[in-house]
From Swiss-Prot:
The gene is epmA. The keyword Cell inner membrane does not apply. This is Elongation factor P--(R)-beta-lysine ligase. GO terms for cellular component: cytosol. PROSITE patterns: AA_TRNA_LIGASE_II. It catalyses: D-beta-lysine + L-lysyl-[protein] + ATP = N(6)-((3R)-3,6-diaminohexanoyl)-L-lysyl-[protein] + AMP + diphosphate + H(+). ATP binds at residues 99-101, 241-242, 297. Its EC number is 6.3.2.-. HAMAP family: EF_P_modif_A. One of its GO terms (biological process) is lysyl-tRNA aminoacylation. GO terms for molecular function: acid-ammonia (or amide) ligase activity; ATP binding; lysine-tRNA ligase activity; tRNA binding. Substrate binds at residues 75-77, 117, 248.
Length: 322
């Protein structure tokens, strides 16, 4: 072990700037009347999303004969929606979340998330509020908005909602995806979006991409105007995905169906099956108000604010140095 390994990966000046930005985030929401909340980091329920890998730990209690597996939070979404169901009104949270994925310049397995929910906001109104926050923190230009379909046609040259599987495979091969013919439609779309769209947008101003394909709805409602798309959006700026938001699904039966479909896909992929969060579904059944919500990566926001290229430069200690 190096004698210098004890030192922080962020400079003290950066940590001072980080604290100032986090204080400004709290001020932004306080001025708008949102309640700051705290929810558990540990839960007996993991997440079914096939794209997320969850850390686990064991609860060892003298009052229990068996150890209990608990999962570290990948997002405070489920407990925050339980608060909404209980009548909290508009809420926000700044918290640590954990995703068992590789570390790199843009990723850390432990990172800080800002998540907030707005009862009776539609997707477009929440997009505007994310834009307001970015201008407030970054002093940047107003965001540009475009649909997923438009962005795909502009930068990939095909319509993602109507293109055939063969056309998607052909395009993916142009971008050097090996064994493209083995991949499903969503994997091909996500690959093409990552390599051909993300690299071209948000260079000079933030960009909001909305109406992702319905097959990528996650916890978003399906659009009532076009059932091929979901009321889901993402923000991109300076080469980083900053935020992911939804007009939230509030139908407990549909949400249960999506969880079950996730677990079926997990089984096909050889991934662990996760127990469905019945407390969350009970809250949906009891009645979560129509709302929109969004999660934003705070460390990435700070990277942009300070002009830094590596996430380890904005956190006190990297995972390798923790």
């Amino acid at each position: 072990m190096s004698e210098h390994q004890w030192k922080p990966t962020a400079s003290i000046q950066t940590l001072l700037s980080r604290a100032k930005i986090i204080a400004e985030i709290r001020q932004f929401f306080s001025e708008r009347g949102l309640l700051e909340v705290e929810t558990p980091i540990l839960s007996e329920f993991g997440v079914t999303d096939v794209h997320l890998s969850t850390f686990s730990t064991k609860l060892i209690s003298p009052f229990q004969k068996k150890e209990k597996t608990l999962w570290l939070s990948t997002s405070p979404e489920y407990p925050m929606k339980r608060l909404l169901s209980a009548g909290s009104g508009a809420i926000f949270q700044l918290c640590k979340v954990f995703r068992n994925e590789e570390a790199g310049k843009k990723h850390s397995p432990e990172f800080t998330m800002l998540e907030w929910y707005r009862p009776y906001f539609d997707m477009y109104r929440l997009i505007n509020e994310v834009d307001d926050l970015l201008q407030y923190i970054l002093d940047c230009e107003p965001a540009e908005s475009m649909s997923y379909q438009f962005a795909f046609q502009e930068y990939v040259g095909i319509d993602p909602l109507s293109a055939s599987q063969d056309k998607l495979i052909e395009k993916a091969k142009e971008y050097c995806l090996e064994n493209a013919e083995r991949e499903d439609r969503d994997t091909l779309l996500q690959f093409l979006f990552n390599v051909a769209v993300e690299s071209q947008i948000g260079k000079d101003k933030p960009v909001a991409i909305y109406h992702f394909p319905a097959t990528q709805a996650a916890l978003a409602q399906i659009s009532s105007e076009d059932h091929r798309v979901a009321e889901r959006f993402e923000f991109y700026y300076k080469g980083l995905e900053l935020a992911n938001g939804f007009c939230e699904l509030t139908d407990a039966n549909e949400q249960r169906h999506r969880f079950e479909q996730d677990n079926k896909q997990r089984e096909r992929l050889g991934l662990p099956i996760h127990q469905i969060d019945e407390r969350f579904l009970a809250a949906l059944k009891a009645g979560v108000p129509n709302c929109s919500g969004v999660a934003l990566g705070v460390d990435r926001l700070i990277m942009i604010a300070l002009g830094l290229e590596n996430i380890n430069e904005v956190i006190a200690f990297s995972i390798e140095n923790a």
